[in-house]
C-alpha cells in the first residue's frame, strides 16, 4: 500500500512539472549600429502574414530594450526593468496602448524587410532591420512615469 502511495505521489509531481513547463520566446534581436539617440537592429518576426510578422519583429525590439538591454549598444541595461511580467502588470495601461494600440510605431524610424517571408511551424517569419528613436522613447517613458529622469 505504501509503495502505491509513493507511486501516485511521484506520478502526480512529474505530471505537474511537465504541465508547468514555461517556454520562453526567443527574442532573435541582433545589434547592428547606433548612437546615443538611435539604435539599429536586425530581428526575426513571426506572424500569419507579412504585416503581422513585421509588427511582431518591431515589438520584439521594444521588449529587448525595455526588459533585457542590448549588448554592444548604448542601451546595455534594460530601460524599464528586468522583471518583464511585473513591469507589464504594474504599467498595464501603458503597455496595452503601446503594443495593442500600435503606439510603438511612433518610435520606429524605419522598418526594412531584408528577407522574404518563409514558412515556419508557428506561421511565417521575416527578417527585418529596425531603427528605433531611443531619445524619444526614453522621453516618453519618463513622461509616463515608467522611468526617472537621469540625475533627478
Task: State where each predicted segment sits.
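Bacterial N-terminal signal peptides that target proteins for export
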Residues: 1-9
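Domain-level marker for long, solvent-exposed, non-transmembrane regions
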Residues: 20-152
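Bacterial N-terminal signal peptides
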Residues: 8-16
Amino acid at each position: 500500500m505504501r509503495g502505491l502511495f509513493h507511486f501516485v505521489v511521484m506520478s502526480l509531481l512529474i505530471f505537474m512539472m511537465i504541465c508547468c513547463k514555461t517556454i520562453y520566446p526567443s527574442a532573435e534581436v541582433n545589434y547592428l549600429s547606433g548612437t546615443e539617440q538611435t539604435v539599429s537592429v536586425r530581428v526575426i518576426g513571426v506572424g500569419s502574414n507579412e504585416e503581422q510578422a513585421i509588427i511582431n519583429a518591431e515589438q520584439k525590439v521594444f521588449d529587448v530594450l525595455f526588459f533585457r538591454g542590448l549588448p554592444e549598444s548604448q542601451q546595455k541595461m534594460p530601460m524599464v526593468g528586468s522583471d518583464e511580467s511585473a513591469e507589464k502588470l504594474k504599467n498595464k495601461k501603458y503597455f496595452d496602448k503601446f503594443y495593442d494600440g500600435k503606439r510603438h510605431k511612433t518610435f520606429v524610424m524605419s522598418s526594412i524587410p531584408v528577407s522574404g517571408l518563409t514558412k515556419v511551424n508557428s506561421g511565417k517569419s521575416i527578417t527585418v532591420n529596425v531603427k528605433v528613436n531611443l531619445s524619444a522613447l526614453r522621453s516618453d517613458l519618463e513622461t509616463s512615469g515608467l522611468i526617472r529622469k537621469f540625475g533627478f
